Amino acid sequence: MKINLILCLLIGSLSYSMLGQVPNDDVFNERGEFRINGLALLAGPALDVSYERIMSSSSGLGGSLLLDLSGDNFGSQNFALTPFYRFYFFDLKDFGARGFFVETFTSFASVRSYDGVSLPFPEGDFEEPKQKDLFQWSLGFAAGRKWVNKGGFSFEFFLGLGRYLLKTDYTDEVHPRIGASFGKRF
């Protein structure tokens, strides 16, 4: 009798404690995510901030803003506004919009170009570069991986290429889209 009473109390207390644990679903409902690209900040230095709106567990829509802080031509872009669409694979449950992703983007950028001017010298011509700022528009693709913890903090890395569509003789034809970003969902 005593064993049955202890067993009933034990099962009852375990059942009651299981009801008291409510899962934290706050991260599941968070639809906005703000990120800063740490790689661009260290390598540039350039400020690259992004906002992504989570559309579903498998897709997101957002934009990035890149500002070259050094004036030394970070990837030849002085300024870039880059809207993007991402499609996420694999880790669709849990937090959604995480895991491996493929991204398509377009970039509207102010690009620094160089136009050479030949100067005659006895040893041969010397070309002195003149800088110009031009507008460029590109389309591209990137791929990467994103992790999100239960607190809503995220880390991602991505790598991609964009091709400039406006032809000039003074700018590159392609540009990289590279990053290691830290962010927070809200």
What are these regions (language model features)?
Residues 1-28, 186:
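Cleavable N-terminal export/targeting peptides
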Residues 21-31, 57-58, 75, 90-99, ...:
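Short loop/turn motifs that connect adjacent beta-strands in outer-membrane beta-barrel proteins
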Residues 39-41, 66-68, 105-109, 158-164, ...:
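Outer-membrane beta-barrel pore domains and translocons
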Residues 87, 174-186:
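Outer-membrane beta-barrel "beta-signal"
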